[in-house]
């Protein structure tokens, strides 16, 4: 999948999101040298930090600079964008619940399931953005429009937007 430079920064960030998703689904890292905790509570803390420093700002950038263009210029883009925004909201709520320390016995017992569910949702969401949204945008948006997205994302990053790290 060759990405237009206007969408490439988001695709690079998506890679980091997919790594996080895999770790949450599996409950471990597939890289034996990775500094990834075995304890699910520590993994939850890592997810919360990753969300606050990377994924949340990434969602904000997509919602501000990419989704309005897709809704306007892509066939059936408004429906696709609405579904992606709904996903963003659901993931924000999931992380908020983890951060709020919903720590009753049932919540603690189901931490594994909640982290796995978040990872599965994030993975599915990224795949839709990469395979549907970005592909349609590259096919249907003008080169000028994609360059404008690139400019806006560059400005967003310069203003302190996400720079993904695990």
Residue ranges and their predicted role:
Residues 1-166:
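Small-residue-biased structural context
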């Amino acid at each position: 999948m060759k990405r237009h430079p206007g969408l490439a920064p988001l695709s690079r960030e998506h890679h980091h999101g997919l790594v996080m998703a895999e770790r949450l689904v599996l409950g471990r890292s597939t890289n034996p040298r990775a500094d990834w905790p075995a304890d699910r509570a520590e993994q939850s803390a890592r997810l919360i930090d990753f969300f606050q420093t990377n994924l949340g700002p990434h969602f904000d950038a997509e919602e501000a600079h990419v989704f309005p263009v897709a809704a306007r210029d892509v066939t059936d883009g408004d429906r696709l964008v609405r579904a992606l925004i709904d996903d963003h909201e659901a993931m924000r709520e999931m992380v908020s619940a983890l951060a709020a320390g919903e720590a009753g016995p049932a919540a603690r017992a189901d931490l594994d399931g909640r982290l796995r569910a978040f990872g599965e949702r994030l993975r599915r969401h990224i795949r839709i953005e990469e395979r549907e949204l970005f592909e349609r945008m590259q096919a249907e948006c003008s080169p000028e429009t994609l360059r404008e997205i690139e400019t806006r994302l560059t400005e967003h990053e310069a203003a302190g937007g996400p720079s993904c790290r695990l």
